[in-house]
């Protein structure tokens, strides 16, 4: 190896060592795309809604970032922010459930895995629930179920459309049957919302699985999804072992579900607000100032 090659290798090692693999972690200047391995300047990635400029991969984002994309500036009013999970079963596997809660709360600044509230989208009202995968994999426990149910009930009372941004590994096993019952509770609240002919849209992001998919994620009047999002109930390996068949490579992706009629539209993150605006207008949602006159 020549001296020039040696210096070039050293520079490459130093450069790569400062690259983060995850947009949610670290404060490095550079981020490597988990899909195509392209290295991007962090500020450029953030300005593009955390979507890779090279391959279009939609990196995972947190609830605050989601709200900023969807809601008009300073329009989001959060509800039920003080609700916090307990440990009704005294559950312990490798670690105590209570310790897992504390760790997730400290790491995310959230009390549980969903943020709910009312906002406006280009001056039109929208009830909004945003699940945050950082909090115990977006799992649905009793607090997540209660907060989503409450925002649906508020939307029903005030005749607002609702959008639920789904990002979840499913029901939270540490709460047992209390977690599973949230599926029925949320579905019941959505039924009353539907009876008033109000619009409900789930946005399926990566990943949307388990009990969330088996309940409110698939009950929308219009089901939206982000590109290449993993959407399903059981895992691919479980299904293949059960059926003893090899599944298609794109199985359980947003594109596969769109092709087979389970998803209505795939929306790129940069187009989400414009798409929501068009849908709300088509469904006759009035701007707040107009609705109050």
From Swiss-Prot:
What is the superkingdom listed in this entry's lineage? Bacteria
Per UniProt, the cofactor note for this protein states: Binds 1 zinc ion per subunit.
Which positions in this protein are listed as binding Zn(2+)?
A: 33, 36, 52, 55
- Report the EC number(s), separated by commas if there are several: 2.1.3.15
Keyword flag Metal-binding: yes
Q: How does it assemble?
A: Acetyl-CoA carboxylase is a heterohexamer composed of biotin carboxyl carrier protein (AccB), biotin carboxylase (AccC) and two subunits each of ACCase subunit alpha (AccA) and ACCase subunit beta (AccD).
- What does the function comment of this entry state? Component of the acetyl coenzyme A carboxylase (ACC) complex. Biotin carboxylase (BC) catalyzes the carboxylation of biotin on its carrier protein (BCCP) and then the CO(2) group is transferred by the transcarboxylase to acetyl-CoA to form malonyl-CoA.
The biological processes this protein is annotated with in GO are: fatty acid biosynthetic process; malonyl-CoA biosynthetic process
Q: Which residues form the CoA carboxyltransferase N-terminal domain?
A: 29-293
The cross-references to InterPro entries, in alphabetical order and at most eight, read:
AcCoA_carboxyl_beta (IPR034733), Acetyl_CoA_COase_Trfase_b_su (IPR000438), ClpP/crotonase-like_dom_sf (IPR029045), COA_CT_N (IPR011762), Znf-ACC (IPR041010)
A single Gene Ontology MF term assigned here is:
carboxyl- or carbamoyltransferase activity
Where found in the cell?
A: Cytoplasm
Which protein family is named in the record? Belongs to the AccD/PCCB family.
Zinc fingers (C4-type), as residue ranges, are 33-55
- Biological pathway: Lipid metabolism; malonyl-CoA biosynthesis; malonyl-CoA from acetyl-CoA: step 1/1
State the SUPFAM superfamilies in the record.
ClpP/crotonase
Can you state which reaction this protein catalyses? N(6)-carboxybiotinyl-L-lysyl-[protein] + acetyl-CoA = N(6)-biotinyl-L-lysyl-[protein] + malonyl-CoA
Q: Which UniProt keywords apply?
A: ATP-binding, Cytoplasm, Fatty acid biosynthesis, Fatty acid metabolism, Lipid biosynthesis, Lipid metabolism, Metal-binding, Nucleotide-binding, Transferase, Zinc, Zinc-finger
Keyword Ribonucleoprotein in annotation: no
Cofactor entry: Zn(2+)
- Kindly report, in one word, the top-level EC class recorded for this enzyme: transferase
Q: What is this protein called?
A: Acetyl-coenzyme A carboxylase carboxyl transferase subunit beta
